[in-house]
Amino acid sequence: MGKEATRVRRRERKNIASGVAHVNSSFNNTTITITDAQGNTIAWSSAGTMGFKGSRKSTPYAAQVAAEDVSKKAQEHGMRTLEVEVAGPGSGRESALRALQAAGFTVTSIRDVTTIPHNGCRPRKRRRV
């Protein structure tokens, strides 16, 4: 008995006019996820999936390329307006936001949803360069 042929199921094209872009920019990478109003993922991309490795993932250019990729995927689903939620301390925040605006989306609101500890976990040690 051989392997059964696995059928590749194509994602059906949803027609969603507005959504939420979650831009998570850490010190190491930038991930961008576009969801509908309920939080269901429509499209996502990151600097790592765009072929950037190592320290190049954390650059603003890598975040811009990832934002252009995810906007192309989301526009295939008919998305036109976005609310943007930006989180994290990384360098790709502004460039990802500019790339989403340049892709033709109407950005209705921009929110910073970075979590701030009320003296929670102990932070990592200071870098000595």
Curated annotation (Swiss-Prot):
A molecular function (GO) term: rRNA binding
Keyword Zinc: no
Family under the similarity heading: Belongs to the universal ribosomal protein uS11 family.
InterPro entries the UniProt entry points to: Ribosomal_uS11, Ribosomal_uS11_bac-type, Ribosomal_uS11_sf
Organism superkingdom: Bacteria
Protein name: Small ribosomal subunit protein uS11
Record Pfam families: Ribosomal_S11
Keyword annotations: Ribonucleoprotein, Ribosomal protein, RNA-binding, rRNA-binding
Subunit structure as annotated in this protein's UniProt entry: Part of the 30S ribosomal subunit. Interacts with proteins S7 and S18. Binds to IF-3.
Classification via NCBIfam families: PRK05309.1, uS11_bact
Function: Located on the platform of the 30S subunit, it bridges several disparate RNA helices of the 16S rRNA. Forms part of the Shine-Dalgarno cleft in the 70S ribosome.
Cellular component terms (Gene Ontology): cytosolic small ribosomal subunit
GO biological process: translation
